[in-house]
Amino acid sequence: MRGFSNEIILKRTLTLSDFTLRYHKRGITALQVIKAPSVSNVPVLLSGDNYGYFVMWDLVTKRPITHMEIEGNSHIIAFWWVETTNVLYILSKDSMLRIFELDSSTQRSIDLVRKLSQANKTDHLQWTKIYEMPINTLNFANFIIEAEVKPTKDNKSYRLVCCHTDDSETIDIYQIIEDSTFKLKRPFNNINFPRFLKQQNFLGISKDSKFGIIMRFAKLNDVIFLGYENGFVVGFKITFDEGLQRDIAELVHVSNDHYPNPILDMCVSGDELYSCSTDDFITKYKIPVNLQLETKYLRDDALLIKCPSSLRVSEPSKVHLPLKNIGHIDKVKDDYLVVSSWSGMTIVYNMRTSEVEQTFVKSKNNLVVSDSSMGDLTNGSGSNTESSSKSHNYKVGAMTCLESFDVQSDGLRLGQLRRIKALAKCNWCLIGYEDGTIKLNKI
C-alpha cells in the first residue's frame, strides 16, 4: 500500500461499534474467547483489567456470567482456559500464575434468554483456586499451556511454557499433572536459546549482543514461538533425544525481520505465524505442518538444545499497513487481518484486496484550542492521523476476534435460536479499552 493517504483511508473506513460491554471500572488488559460447554453452548468471553478483576461474559445477552477479584488487585496479563478440565490459568503483574477450577458441583448451562431480574445472578458458578506459582512478568509476556503427547488414563497432563523465574531472556517448561492432588514438575529449567545461537555463530551474532526479554509466546501445532525484545523470533518443539534418553528442545525456526524493534504480539492461523512490532508492517511465516526429519544436528547437551544443521533464517512475506506501533494482532477466516496500534486505532485489513475495510476507535471527544490566530476549536486532527489521535483516543488494552460458527438448534426455543444465530452468523472484533469498556464490532 504505497502512495495512499493514511488519514483519508482511516477516516473513510471509520465504523461505529455494535455493542458495548460495561462492568470493569479499570483499563482492560486481557481478552480471550473460549468454549466452555459447562457454562454455555456458545463461545463466551473472558476479560481482565489492571486492578485484578476477571469477568466471564455471555456474548448473546451481553451480560456477565460470573466475576472474580484476584487477591492484591494485581494487573491481569493473560488467561489460558483448559476446556477438558474446566481449569483457568490467570497470570498477573505481581509475578504469580494462579490456577482456578470451575466448581463441578455448581456447573450448569446458562439460559441464554433468562429474565432481566435473573441476569446478574451468578452465585451458581464458583471458582476455586487450586494452585499458584511465581513467574517472571517483568515484560508482560503471556504463557502457553499445551496438552502432553502421552497422557495417562488416570490423569491429564499439560506443559506450561513461560518465562524463567529470574531470567526473562530464558524459559522454563513445567509438567502439570491434574489428578486428585495436582502435581507440578519442572523438566526444563532456564532454557537459553540466545546463548545457543551465539555459541553456534548463527547469523554471525556477536556473543556480546543482547536479545533482551521475551515479549510474547505463540503456539502453532507442536511448535512454540518466542518473540524477543530485539525483534528475533525463535520456534522450537520438544523431541525425544535417543542419545540423552530424555526430551530436549529442538529449534526449528529463527527469524529477525523486526530487528532491532521488539516483538509486540504474535498470532497463528492455519499453518501461518504472524508477528508485529513498532514497524508499519506485519510479517507472515508459513510453517510446515509436518517438519522434515533431519539426520545432522548442531547441539549443546548442557543447554538441552539442538537444531538441524540445515536451519536457516526464515524468509517471510510482509504486509504493509497505514499504522505503526502495532500492539495487538489477530486473524479472522482466510482474508482478514485485525490490528490495533498504540494510537488507539484498530483496523480490519483485507489481505486479498490489500485494503483497509474498517477502522474502530473510541474517542475521548476532547476539544483542543488551536494556537492559530484564527482561534478555531478543533478535535486535534492533523496531517498525521495516528500521532495526532494518540492523545485523543482511548488506548487499546486488549483485542481478540470471534469467527462465525455453526449453531446446533436441538432443544432451543425459537427466541433462543434467533439470538444465538445473530451472534453466530457474523465475525466479530472485540476491543478492550483503558476506560474499562469492551466494544463488540461486526466484521
Swiss-Prot record:
GO aspect biological process, one term: chromatin organization
Please list the residue ranges that the record marks as compositionally biased, kind Low complexity.
378-391
Keywords of this protein's UniProt record, alphabetized?
Chromatin regulator, Nucleus, Repeat, WD repeat
Tagged with keyword Repeat = yes
> So where does this one cross the membrane?
none
Subcellular localization is given as: Nucleus
Location of region: Disordered: 372-391
Q: Keyword Protein biosynthesis on this protein? A: no
Tell me the disulfide pairings in this chain: none
Each WD repeat occupies one of these ranges, namely 23-67, 71-110, 258-295, 318-359
State the family it belongs to.
Answer: Belongs to the WD repeat ASA1 family.
Q: How would you summarize the oligomeric state and partners of this protein? A: Component of the ASTRA chromatin remodeling machinery complex composed of at least RVB1, RVB2, TRA1, TEL2, TTI1 and TTI2.
Give the protein's function: Component of the ASTRA complex involved in chromatin remodeling.
Q: State what protein this is by name.
A: ASTRA-associated protein 1
Supply the source organism for this entry. Saccharomyces cerevisiae (strain JAY291) (Baker's yeast)
